């Protein structure tokens, strides 16, 4: 089987991939993450996942390369990674007491340019929390580098009232979908 490369430097994505116990390595894709404004959220994450996978695949054409991208959507607004604590506070205020969606695009590009891709959506509802609790959560700095300004795999799970879908999707990589794509590509487990 060809080498497997994760087109990401995300520690959360690497931790999820490590759980599969498949040999792989991670490499930064180094791509522009700006997409056309007319794209829907699901089209945008599909496009970005493809862009990341293809960028690394160009450097390693005989490998299978897995790319992923994630966006948070609440009330029709897309939330990306906050630039600072104030932006994180504003994002979290939009999420508390409401349901939002996490969309993750996954793209697997292989030898000969074979492409397998999918988009996974998970819906989450946050408790209504008081401003003081929100500030204490912000003090933990889990918002740094996270779409939506929280980490459900850490203390952010205490904000979570309900989750519908794949929990690993919320952490950055929908593993049920990833395993399906890897199996379709011919990867064997165990």
Swiss-Prot record:
Disulfide bonds: none annotated. It is found in: Cytoplasm. The active site is at residue 69. Its EC number is 3.6.1.9. Its cofactor is a divalent metal cation. It comes from the Bacteria. It catalyses: a ribonucleoside 5'-triphosphate + H2O = a ribonucleoside 5'-phosphate + diphosphate + H(+); a 2'-deoxyribonucleoside 5'-triphosphate + H2O = a 2'-deoxyribonucleoside 5'-phosphate + diphosphate + H(+). Its main location: cytoplasm. The keyword Cytoplasm applies. The keyword Metal-binding does not apply. Belongs to the Maf family. PANTHER family: BIFUNCTIONAL DTTP/UTP PYROPHOSPHATASE/METHYLTRANSFERASE PROTEIN-RELATED (PTHR43213), BIFUNCTIONAL DTTP_UTP PYROPHOSPHATASE_METHYLTRANSFERASE PROTEIN-RELATED (PTHR43213:SF5). Nucleoside triphosphate pyrophosphatase. May have a dual role in cell division arrest and in preventing the incorporation of modified nucleotides into cellular nucleic acids. This is Nucleoside triphosphate pyrophosphatase.
